[in-house]
Design a protein with these regions (language model features):
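Short, Lys/Arg-enriched N-terminal segments with co-localized hydrophobic residues
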Residues: 25-39
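Active-site rim loops that border cofactor/substrate pockets in soluble metabolic enzymes
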Residues: 78-84, 266-308, 312-317, 405, ...
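Flexible, glycine/charged-enriched surface loops at secondary-structure junctions
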Residues: 72-73, 249-258, 281-289, 380-388, ...
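N-terminal glycine-rich phosphate/adenylate-binding segment common to multiple enzyme folds
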Residues: 85-212, 225, 313
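Glycine-rich phosphate/diphosphate-binding loop of Rossmann-like nucleotide-binding domains
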Residues: 45-68, 204-292
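Buried hydrophobic positions in well-ordered alpha/beta secondary-structure cores of metabolic enzymes
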Residues: 51-54, 103, 182, 242, ...
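N-terminal beta-loop-helix "entrance" segment that forms/cooperates
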Residues: 71-96, 296-298
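Glycine-rich phosphate/nucleotide-binding loop
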Residues: 134, 298-400
Length: 433
């Protein structure tokens, strides 16, 4: 259902790149949009299928939401590779305006490529306009300050992809994994403050650091520089959110996962703030691990961990590591939460090679679990729990499993080998609702 205001936004919305080298509106412009007195629905979800299998799995999540009686209007918004190629902007202004109006988005997946390859795929008439490709999901997080990313990684009993280790006397153990990663979502190495062939003023600033002497004889043409930016406010928000979640849901520890023994300033700030925040949560232990050691420990004793908090890149890494213990990216959901808006998405990519398979074989569970996180955010937790129980029952029964759960290589032939289709998995979940 599309409201008249939303239809007008989609029909007349700016289909150009906004005149700013493909970069979406700045914070000041967005603030104005957020404050506009739009005709606003309290329950309109902006759906963004995006690219590849995003177009396959998002409709499956909507089927499940409808089955549990979730009442909302939806408006589909444009995002992704198609709009980069045809407009020079993978995050069109009309999509930004819809998110600013309705505050809640459900997102599928995007295709993202290096900037030189992206430039070659622009429409010919756009190739001389100076557009530079950017990740629309990263831009969305920064534009709306969706600074808190939650990535729960929980094992479903009976999932054949669950982590199993050798126990005493060669017996098999399947530890219960129940971890929630809080990833700082807008800063760090993903902030996008970087240069190839850095300009003279950047080089001059770098030269003020004594350790840059090692690069004094390297020409700027041979240098690439990325800045790892942490701010105290962002660290305090993500660490506090992690501790509050741990207290609310009964986790006994919060682990700061960084690398302060080497990256002393930025990782050191996160750990320092972790220690300060923990003083207000005396019932919860503060642990700290280095990212490299954490990747070892998660494959040794994953059940030891409850809530983990990390910067942008390390949070990305450790959450994928834990996802691998509970079935892989087909089970990995996430929430991007800011003070004004929230967007919910599976963490998998667009897998374009599977987009046009008919019937589809991809696993819709990560997308459906992301929709559950949206329900939690909207205080519809009872509906979310019903869906999670239905998913658990389907997995435990073991009769309707996608190709990844059967450990089959992808491709059209997996159905003949017993793999369920995307729709069959959703149907099995619906039957238990």
């Amino acid at each position: 259902v599309i409201s008249p205001a939303d239809e007008e936004t989609r029909r007349t919305g700016n289909r150009s790149a906004g005149g700013r080298r493909g970069v979406p509106k700045g914070a000041k412009e967005l603030e104005i949009v957020l404050k506009e007195k739009h005709e606003m629905s309290a329950r309109t979800i902006v759906t963004m299928p995006g690219d590849g299998i995003g177009k396959v799995v998002l409709p499956e999540a909507l089927r499940v939401l409808d089955k549990v009686g979730f009442s909302a209007s939806t408006v589909e918004a444009d995002i992704g590779w198609e709009f980069w190629c045809t407009e020079g902007n993978p995050l069109p202004e009309r999509t930004v305006e819809l998110l600013a109006r309705h505050k809640v988005g459900l997102f599928g997946a995007i295709t993202s490529k290096p900037k030189t390859e992206a430039a070659r795929e622009l429409a010919p008439e756009l190739q001389t306009r100076g557009y530079t490709y950017f990740s629309p999901i990263v831009a969305m997080r920064q534009l709306f300050n969706l600074d808190i990313c939650m990535r729960p990684c929980r094992s479903f009993p009976g999932n054949p992809l669950n982590f199993i280790r050798k126990g005493p006397a060669g017996s098999a153990e399947e530890p219960l994994v129940d971890v929630v990663i809080f990833r700082q979502n807008t800063e760090g190495l993903y902030s996008g403050v970087e240069w190839t062939n850095p300009p003279a003023e950047v080089r001059a600033a770098l030269a003020t650091h004594p350790k840059f002497k090692a690069y004094a004889d390297v020409s700027s043409a041979d240098l690439a520089v990325s800045c790892r930016i942490f701010t105290r406010r962002a660290c305090e928000r993500i660490v506090t959110a992690a501790f509050e979640h741990a207290r609310k849901f009964g986790y006994k520890s919060v682990t700061v996962c960084e690398k302060p023994n080497v990256i002393r300033e930025t990782s050191g700030m996160m750990l320092e703030i972790g220690r300060a925040v923990q003083k207000g949560f005396a019932d919860i232990e503060l642990w700290n691990t280095n990212i490299d050691a954490q990747m070892m420990w998660l494959t040794k004793n994953p059940e030891d961990y409850g809530v983990i908090v990390a910067g942008n890149m390390f949070g990305d890494i450790v959450s994928d590591g834990f996802a691998g213990l509970v079935g892989g990216l087909g089970f990995a959901c996430s929430a991007n939460i800011g003070e004004e808006c929230a967007v919910f998405e599976p963490t998998h990519g667009s897998a374009p090679k599977y987009e046009k398979l008919d019937p589809s074989i991809v696993n819709p569970i990560a997308m459906i679990l992301s929709a559950c996180m949206m329900l939690d955010h909207l205080d519809e937790t009872e509906k979310a729990e019903r869906i999670r129980r239905a998913i658990a029952e389907v997995i435990a029964e073991g009769k309707v499993l996608t190709y990844d759960m059967l450990k089959l290589p992808g491709g059209a032939g997996v159905i003949a080998k017993g793999a369920a289709t995307t729709q069959q998995v959703t149907d099995a979940i619906l039957a238990r609702l």
